[in-house]
Amino acid sequence: MGLLLLVLILTPLLAAYRHPDFPLLEKAQQLLQSTGSPYSTNCWLCTSSSTETPGTAYPASPREWTSIEAELHISYQWDPNLKGLMRPANSLLSTVKQDFPDIRQKPPIFGPIFTNINLMGIAPICVTAKRKNGTNVGTLPSTVCNVTFTVDPNQQTYQTYTHNQFRHQPRFPKPPNITFPQGTLLDKSTRFCQGRPSSCSTRNFWFRPADYNQCLQISNLSSTAEWVLLDQTRNSLFWENKTKGANQSQTPCVQVLAGMTIATSYLGISAVSEFFGNSLTPLFHFHISTCLKTQGAFYICGQSIHQCLPSNWTGTCTIGYVTPDIFIAPGNLSLPIPIYGKSQLPRVRRAIHFIPLLAGLGILAGTGTGIAGITKASLTYSQLSKEIANNIDTMAKTLTTVQEQIDSLAAVVLQNRRGLDMLTAAQGGICLALDEKCCFWVNQSGKVQDNIRQLLNQASSLRERATQGWLNWEGTWKWFSWVLPFIGPFVSLLLLLLFGPCLLNLITQFVSSRLQAIKLQTNLSAGRRPRTIQESPF
């Protein structure tokens, strides 16, 4: 009985669900084509979905090399021979972490973001690092680089401290040296490289005061009014406009070139301690990686794109920007946008989940709650169908207004045409005067009106189906969704009250008969004949 009631309740709910009316899409597409809408005739700007060539890389300009900001990530490794220097080494390491806020201690995630990227154009600056045991990130060919800086990563540098200097701020040596092609640098008299960028912390050891004699001009990247300068002390690039004077306010704290050279360095701190007879003892090693902090900029290394370069990297890289591959599709090209009709619509099989009817009112109450959820979803779908129908009506009215404007404009154009024909009647009309082959206008407003009428009919049909059904009466669905969860427990209680006494009576008779049979069997097994009422002595 409960299963039959469940089926009766679920049947109208499942029947209320229907697939969307996909011919509406076909009508809308035909309407756009017949009205000559720009959405159906203009070119489409599309991005490539191919995974082989995900995009194209463009190199950064020399000025962008001076403005793109980089950041450093530091990691350290203890020397296994610390022994008695563990406490002072910990003190020195805590000083390093506190005094250099421009260095991040969390290591970044390495690896190429994209591969098979093509570099368009010539890169003004490339940086090459060669290390036998380094991490290869990719190599650009020399033909795409205007100026190539070669980093000498084989330099191993240590900073020496005595035991009583552990509490002072450490000063690391300058970054590794870089070499340049012959004739690239010109010694120009300028003080532009001196000073410190305003965005840099005063405790940053990478921007120590620069030497005046170490500020050199890169001839291949400079012009008469604009100079690209290299500070060999800090391995940083500066852009100077000779007509506006020197100003380093826009210079980032850590530049790209400085970060790339620092990431190839091998830095360590040693100490002269009395524990080892005042001999030079290594304490710990620093490994520094670099990342681009400016949004949209990447390291371009060969055909790979990186956001960060690991410590001890090797290869040839430049910086630039990446754009996805874009192609222009003409208006008459069929784009891969599937539009289905009723006959082509792939039907989705919907499985109906039946709750097993087990004993207990709790299971039946859960069934009522499930029915309420299905009803709520059906009501939501109906409301969505109404909104879609309203939107279609609005779109049809808008297209009707556009068509009326086009008809009005066509009437004005034809009126002007008649006037021009009268003025050029001696030459056979404006068409012959201009030697035009197509001089006729085909009025297709009737097709547009027919398509709009069909679109409105489809919207009206969709709205009627959404408002039909015993669960969609206007004004009842708002309170019915609250009452429906109590129907399951109420019906279960009603069934229990109707059939409970009968079931209890049957169970009582069954138990009584079984007890009488057991008692009779017990008397027979004891050898006594049961007495009837007539044989009783009483």
From Swiss-Prot:
| Gene3D superfamilies from the UniProt entry | 1.10.287.210
Q: Which residues are glycosylated?
A: 133, 146, 177, 220, 241, 247, 312, 332, 443
Per UniProt, the short sequence motif CKS-17 occupies residue numbers 414-430
Start and end residues of each stretch annotated as Fusion peptide: 354-374
InterPro entries in UniProt: TLV/ENV_coat_polyprotein
UniProt keyword list: Cell membrane, Cleavage on pair of basic residues, Disulfide bond, ERV, Glycoprotein, Membrane, Signal, Transmembrane, Transmembrane helix, Transposable element
GO cellular component terms listed in the entry, alphabetical order: plasma membrane
Database matches in PANTHER family: SYNCYTIN-2 (PTHR10424:SF85), VIRAL ENVELOPE PROTEIN (PTHR10424)
What protein family is recorded? Belongs to the gamma type-C retroviral envelope protein family. HERV class-I FRD env subfamily.
Q: What is this protein for, i.e. what is its function?
A: This endogenous retroviral envelope protein has retained its original fusogenic properties and participates in trophoblast fusion and the formation of a syncytium during placenta morphogenesis. The interaction with MFSD2A is apparently important for this process. Endogenous envelope proteins may have kept, lost or modified their original function during evolution and this one is unable to confer infectivity.
Protein's UniProt name: Syncytin-2
Q: Which organism is it from?
A: Hylobates moloch
